[in-house]
Amino acid sequence: MIRSLRMQPNRKLYFKELPMPSTPGPGEVQVRMAFASICGYDMMMLRGTAAYPLNGYLGHEGSGVVTAVGENVRALHPGDRVTINPYEPCGLCDACRSNRPEYCTNPSSGYANLMTEYL
């Protein structure tokens, strides 16, 4: 079991016990989280001035160490240090078509629950 920091609708924080993530599937990696920041948006949610996060997830900026890789993963290996970007670029806007997905103007909204032990 692993622990994940969550927020209740009444804005109180708690740890939720979750099963250890399964072995990564094709194209997936498993990451042991090392750091996850509390950003301004997290603070707004905690203060009640921003929408309650989906499933009470907190954290969308973090880093960790790859612990396992699935089939067809070539660029990452166990032991590699990584940062996590929970947003999926749209692939259609000018930035994405110019190979600059970090400037995507229509990313998916992603709260990745980075305040956890493993992804």
Residue ranges and their predicted role:
Residues 1-5:
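Short structural boundary motif marking the start of a folded domain
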Residues 6-13:
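Extracellular beta-rich ligand/substrate-recognition surface
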Residues 13, 90-119:
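NAD(P)H dinucleotide-binding glycine-rich loop of Rossmann-like/cofactor-binding domains
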Residues 16-18:
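Short structured motifs
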Residues 20-21, 53-59, 106-117:
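Short Gly/Pro-enriched turn/cap motifs at secondary-structure boundaries
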Residues 21-36, 46-97:
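Glycine-rich beta-strand-centered segment in the early N-terminal region that forms part
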Residues 39:
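Conserved Rossmann-like nucleotide-cofactor binding loop
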